[in-house]
Amino acid sequence: EMSASLVGSEMCIRDSYYDAEKAPYDALLNEYERGVDTQQLDVFFDTLRKGLVPLIRAIGEKPQIDDSFLHLEYPVEQQKAFADYLMEVMGLDRGHCGLGETEHPFTLEFNNKDVRITTNYDLHNVASSMYSVLHEGGHALYELGIRDDLQYTCLTGGVSMGVHESQSRFYENLIGRSRAFIGAIYPKVQEFFPAQLGNVTAEQFYRAVNKVEPLSLIHI
């Protein structure tokens, strides 16, 4: 972390020499989203804020969804087996994609034959590891899908951070939190956690994992 901080500081200083009028953060931003600057993002996020803030407030005034069953005790070994199942559902070849455990989930790619993802198992929040696996699995599928002739070029590792995140969030949210996906996998989910979810319907589970709160973490 210290070395990354020093590199970031050096980049900000370097960029200030190139263009003293430019915001220092643009030096770092350009490393991840080439051609995008803070002025463009200010317009983008201002537009989002106008729609999202009232929406979140309106949802907050509605009756709260019961997600208490997600916070029962879920043994880690069962969560690990469930994570393996999710990787299988996603089509991740375990011969080319490993799964490890860490404090904060991340994906590490060496090439399109060796990508490794990690997750964190919360004893009292089964959705945490579930959606971390789907999220990091999305990153992994992107890396595993890069053509052989593009390996070790500037196009490997993702063309931008935004594009990479679009793939991970697609699997995590658009697929993983959809009613169709939950309905398809839920009988298997109940097999992994019969004591916790045996009397919980697929619709209840779907609503619980889509619960919106004013202040909530992105992942864990």
Tell me the role of every PLM-derived stretch.
Residues A180-L217:
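Long, amphipathic alpha-helical stalk/connector segments used for oligomerization, subunit docking
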Residues S9-E10, R14-V126:
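Contiguous, non-catalytic segments that form substrate-binding/exosite surfaces or channel walls
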Residues E61-K62, K113, G145-Y152, R207-L215:
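Short acidic (Asp/Glu) and glycine-rich catalytic loops that position anionic groups and cofactors
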Residues M2-I13, I218-H219:
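Single conserved hydrophobic/aromatic residue that forms the stacking wall/gate
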Residues E143-S166:
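Post-HEXXH active-site segment of zinc metalloproteases
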Residues G158-A195:
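Post-HExxH zinc-binding segment in Zn-dependent metallohydrolases
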Residues G35, A58-D67, R147-T153, R177-Y186:
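Inter-helical turn/loop segments and adjacent helix faces that build the functional surface
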Residues Y131-L144, E165-R169:
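Active-site recognition of the HExxH zinc-binding catalytic motif
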